[in-house]
C-alpha cells in the first residue's frame, strides 16, 4: 500500500482518538446537535480504524514470519514459508478493503430522492414506456422497503405518463437510484402496430437527492412566480373544485415545477418548493463538479436526453447498459423490479473508477 495512503490512515486514527475524547466531554454531551454529528463521525471512523489496526497486525505477523525464514532449523524455515504465504494474502486482502473504505463518499447517497420520468420521442408509445419504467421502479422500491409517493403526474390517454414526479423515501435511495439518470430506450412492437414492425421510443429519467431543509438553497421570493390551478387525477378520476395545484417558476433559471397530486394547495406548494430546491441544488452541484467530470468519467448521467444509458429490447428479451457494455437476457425480471443484475455491476464499476483515482492521488 502506498505510503501516502498509510499516512492518510494515520491521520484518521488521530481524528478517531480526538472524536472519542470529545464524546466524553460534558460540554459536547450538553450540545445535542454536536453530539449527534460526532457520534456519526465516530461510527464512520471506527470501521476504518479497526480495519487499519488489523492491517498493521497482519504486517507484523508477516515481518515475524520473514524473520523465521532465516532460521537454521529447516522445519522452522518450512513453517515460515507457509506463514509468509498466508500472511501476504491477509495483508493484500486487508489493504484492498482499506482502500475501498477510503473511497470518497457522496454525502447525498444516504438521502431520499426525487424521481422524474418524462416521455420523449415515440408519442403514445413513449408515454406507455414511462409507465412501465415507473412500475419497475415502484416494484424495486418495494423490494428495498422504500416508500414511493407520486407528487405530480400527467397521464397519457393511451396509458402511461407524459411526465411523472415521485419521491422515494428510504435509506440509501439516492445512492442506488442515481445510476438510473439518463436516457432509456425501448424497442418493441406497439399493440397498435398492425404490420408487426418494431418501434423505438425513449424516456428521460432524472434522479435528484432530497435536500434537507437546513441545507436547502435560499430562494428569493421575488425570483419566484407562483401559479395555482385546478388539478385532476390520472385519467380524470377526480377534479378539485378549488385551485389546489401549484406551479412554481424560478425566474432566473426558468426552472418550472408543478405539483397537483395532493388535495391541499399548501401541501402541493411545499412539495413543489422541495423539488425546485433539489433541482437548483443539482444544477449547482453539476456546475461545481464540471471540472472533475472532465478528469474522471462519471457513471451517473446528467439526465440529458442524448445521454442514452440503457436499451430494453422486447423481441430479444434483453436489457443493455451502454455505460459498461453490459447485456442481460432478463427483461421480464428487470421490468418486474429486479434491478440487482444491473445495479451490482455498475456499482462495482464505479468503485473501480474511484479506486483507480485513489491509487493516483497524493494525499
From Swiss-Prot:
Which superkingdom does the taxonomy of this entry point to?
Bacteria
Gene Ontology, cellular component aspect: cytoplasm
Q: Where is the composition biased (Basic and acidic residues)?
A: 282-295
Please state where this protein is localized.
Cytoplasm
**Chain positions covered by the region annotation Disordered:** 281-302
**PTM summary:** Methylated by PrmC. Methylation increases the termination efficiency of RF1.
According to the UniProt record, list the residues that bear N5-methylglutamine.
Answer: 237
NCBIfam families listed in its UniProt record: prfA, PRK00591.1
Tell me the protein family, please. Answer: Belongs to the prokaryotic/mitochondrial release factor family.
Which named protein is this? Peptide chain release factor 1
Amino acid at each position: 500500500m502506498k505510503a501516502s495512503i498509510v499516512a492518510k490512515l494515520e491521520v484518521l486514527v488521530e481524528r478517531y482518538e480526538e472524536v472519542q475524547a470529545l464524546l466524553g466531554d460534558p460540554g459536547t454531551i450538553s450540545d445535542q446537535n454536536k453530539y449527534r454529528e460526532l457520534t456519526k463521525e465516530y461510527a464512520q471512523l471506527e470501521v476504518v480504524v479497526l480495519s487499519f489496526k488489523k492491517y498493521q497486525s497482519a504486517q507484523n505477523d508477516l515481518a515475524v514470519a520473514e524473520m523465521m525464514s532465516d532460521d537454521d532449523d529447516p522445519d522452522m524455515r518450512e513453517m515460515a514459508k507457509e506463514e509468509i504465504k498466508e500472511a501476504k494474502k491477509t495483508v493484500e486482502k486487508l489493504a484492498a478493503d482499506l482502500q475501498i473504505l477510503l473511497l470518497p463518499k457522496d454525502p447525498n447517497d444516504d438521502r431520499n430522492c426525487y424521481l422524474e420520468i418524462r416521455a420523449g420521442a415515440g408519442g403514445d408509445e413513449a408515454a406507455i414506456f414511462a409507465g412501465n419504467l415507473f412500475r419497475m421502479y415502484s416494484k424495486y422500491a418495494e423490494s428495498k422497503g422504500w416508500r414511493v409517493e407520486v407528487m405530480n403526474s400527467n397521464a397519457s390517454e393511451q396509458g402511461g405518463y407524459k411526465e411523472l414526479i415521485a419521491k422515494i423515501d428510504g435509506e440509501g435511495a439516492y445512492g442506488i437510484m442515481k445510476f438510473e439518470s439518463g436516457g432509456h430506450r425501448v424497442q418493441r412492437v406497439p399493440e397498435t402496430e398492425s404490420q408487426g414492425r418494431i418501434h423505438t421510443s425513449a424516456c428521460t429519467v432524472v434522479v435528484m437527492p432530497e435536500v434537507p431543509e437546513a441545507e436547502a438553497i435560499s430562494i428569493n421570493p421575488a425570483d419566484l412566480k407562483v401559479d395555482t390551478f385546478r388539478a385532476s387525477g390520472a385519467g380524470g378520476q377526480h377534479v378539485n373544485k378549488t385551485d389546489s395545484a401549484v406551479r412554481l417558476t424560478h425566474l432566473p433559471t426558468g426552472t418550472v415545477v408543478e405539483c397537483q397530486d395532493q388535495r391541499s394547495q399548501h401541501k402541493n406548494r411545499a412539495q413543489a418548493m422541495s423539488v425546485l430546491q433539489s433541482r437548483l441544488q443539482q444544477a449547482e452541484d453539476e456546475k461545481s463538479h464540471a471540472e472533475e467530470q472532465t478528469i474522471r468519467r462519471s457513471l451517473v448521467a446528467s439526465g440529458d436526453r442524448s445521454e442514452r444509458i440503457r436499451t430494453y429490447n422486447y423481441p430479444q428479451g434483453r436489457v443493455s447498459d451502454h455505460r459498461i457494455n453490459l447485456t442481460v437476457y432478463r427483461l421480464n425480471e428487470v421490468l418486474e423490479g429486479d434491478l440487482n443484475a444491473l445495479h451490482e455491476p455498475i456499482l462495482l464499476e464505479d468503485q473501480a473508477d474511484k479506486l483507480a483515482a485513489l491509487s493516483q492521488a497524493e494525499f
